[in-house]
């Protein structure tokens, strides 16, 4: 039985017994998407099984006051309710007396979901989509990452672990065995891995997994990052999903392929539609994403460093336009049609909280559908080579140049604020404004190197 399969309490207990599980991690994420957990030992005998049954049925209490973006000390008691379909043994932990994890929803009490829990927020939006429009939202992300080794000349510095480039093989690509171990670990966790390969920059890699409903995919992104970091550590390396770890190299993106289905049918395809079969629904969804793009990147590209990637060049998706094959636009529509018709939003990076990013992308696209927005004409020329005047004539704007500007846009976007909910929005803004202030007031090595001469 693998993660993703429905499981009742008795089946979960049998899974624990069969896999000789000694510890269970009850896992959730904070407002920034960092995984948190509390581990419970599985005790022997019938008494231990009864304790486990009670925990699986009722959840575990914890102090939420120390979790970023959650609650104050005066309301700290919170409850983790496990989603047993996510119960899975962690393949990088010892096989003997193994460790399993289960992803949880955060509750304020036995019956009330916590409005600051990112996973619960995405679930609520997906339930609303199902109830109001009989809709489903599917996402297929492509998170890129670097594998790093310590610089032999400076052990405090990390450098790319190989000199390979796009699709390279040995000896330029030193990491096929590591990617093999990553793929095997992901498959043990229930992932449907489609491909793995070296990316453009030295030390940069991509492992692609099959799309799924947005909730499972968000869970998958968190699990994916944990898996890669732990497998890299076993090989003496460090994995990073930092958007732009090195000047002069491509950064790490997380392009998000996505589609919405209504009444069990794909809604983005119309054999009679323009652009080789795109439906009005698809074009309105595109228009919605484009109209909210400036604010959306505050969520999908949430760090100061994110905007070192979002600069012209290095294939960075900064231009608010859409296209069919043209990768210089922020939205691309892959060639596949029929059930595979989808759009690719190219701005996101892997530092985003996937629960919040998916919730906001969906809200932006649905706003376009509900308001019957009209998408502009696709731009099939290389936008990177256009002059500012050419872009102005075509109405092509750029995403904000930094995190502060993106947060300013989010402050003006009521649709995305509603998608986040009051608690998450207010806490997120407070955290990110403070992050920007930390950066704004920091004195960097570049500055001292440039200005000490004065």
From Swiss-Prot:
Residues given in the record as ATP binding sites: 194, 257-259, 327, 332, 339
InterPro entries for this protein: Gln_synt_N, Gln_synt_N_sf, Gln_synth/guanido_kin_cat_dom, Gln_synth_cat_dom, Gln_synth_gly_rich_site, Gln_synth_I, Gln_synth_N_conserv_site
Catalyzed chemical reaction(s): L-glutamate + NH4(+) + ATP = L-glutamine + ADP + phosphate + H(+)
Residues binding L-glutamate: 250-251, 309, 315, 327, 346
Transmembrane segments annotated in the record for this chain: none
EC identifiers of the protein: 6.3.1.2
Pfam families for this protein: Gln-synt_C, Gln-synt_N
PANTHER family membership: GAMMA-GLUTAMYLPUTRESCINE SYNTHETASE, TYPE-1 GLUTAMINE SYNTHETASE 2
Role this protein plays: Probably involved in nitrogen metabolism via ammonium assimilation. Catalyzes the ATP-dependent biosynthesis of glutamine from glutamate and ammonia. Beta-glutamate is a much poorer substrate than alpha-glutamate.
Protein name, per record: Glutamine synthetase
Source organism per UniProt: Methanocaldococcus jannaschii (strain ATCC 43067 / DSM 2661 / JAL-1 / JCM 10045 / NBRC 100440) (Methanococcus jannaschii)
Name of the encoding gene: glnA
């Amino acid at each position: 039985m693998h993660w993703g399969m429905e499981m009742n309490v008795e089946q979960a207990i049998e899974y624990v017994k069969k896999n000789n599980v000694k510890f269970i991690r009850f896992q959730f994420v904070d407002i920034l998407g960092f995984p948190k957990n509390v581990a419970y030992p599985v005790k022997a005998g019938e008494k231990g099984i009864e304790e486990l049954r009670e925990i699986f049925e009722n959840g575990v209490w914890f102090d939420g006051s120390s979790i970023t973006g959650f609650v104050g000390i005066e309301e700290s008691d919170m409850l983790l309710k496990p989603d047993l379909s996510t119960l899975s043994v962690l393949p990088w932990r010892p096989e003997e007396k193994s460790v399993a994890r289960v992803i949880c929803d955060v509750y304020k009490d036995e019956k009330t979901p916590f409005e600051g829990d990112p996973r619960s927020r995405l679930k609520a939006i997906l339930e609303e989509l199902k109830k109001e429009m009989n809709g489903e939202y599917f996402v297929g992300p492509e998170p890129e990452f670097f594998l790093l080794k310590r610089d032999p000349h400076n052990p405090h510095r990390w450098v790319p672990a190989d000199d390979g480039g796009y699709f390279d093989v040995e000896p330029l690509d030193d990491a096929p065995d590591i990617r093999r171990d990553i793929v095997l670990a992901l498959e043990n966790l229930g992932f449907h891995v489609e491909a793995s390969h070296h990316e453009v920059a030295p030390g940069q890699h991509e492992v692609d997994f099959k799309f799924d409903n947005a909730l499972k995919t968000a869970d998958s992104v968190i699990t994916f990052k944990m898996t890669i970091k732990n497998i890299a550590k076993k090989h003496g390396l460090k994995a990073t999903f930092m958007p732009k770890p090195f000047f002069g190299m491509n950064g790490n993106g997380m392009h998000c392929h996505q589609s919405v289905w209504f009444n069990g049918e794909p809604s983005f395809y119309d054999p009679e539609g323009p652009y080789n079969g795109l439906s009005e629904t698809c074009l309105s969804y595109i228009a919605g994403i484009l109209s909210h793009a400036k604010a959306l990147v505050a969520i999908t590209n949430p760090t100061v460093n994110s905007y070192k990637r979002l600069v012209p060049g290095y294939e960075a998706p900064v231009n608010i336009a859409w296209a069919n094959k043209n990768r210089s636009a922020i939205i691309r529509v892959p060639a596949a049609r029929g059930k595979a018709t989808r759009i690719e939003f190219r701005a996101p990076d892997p530092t985003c909280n996937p629960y919040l990013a998916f919730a906001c992308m969906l809200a932006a696209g649905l706003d376009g559908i509900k308001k019957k927005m009209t998408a502009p004409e696709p731009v099939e020329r290389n936008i990177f080579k256009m002059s500012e005047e050419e872009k102005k004539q075509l109405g092509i704007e750029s995403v904000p140049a930094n995190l502060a500007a993106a947060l300013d846009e989010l402050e003006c976007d009521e649709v995305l604020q509603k998608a986040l909910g009051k608690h998450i929005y207010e806490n997120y803004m407070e955290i990110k404004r403070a992050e920007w202030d930390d950066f704004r007031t920091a004195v960097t090595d570049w500055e001292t190197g440039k200005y000490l001469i004065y």
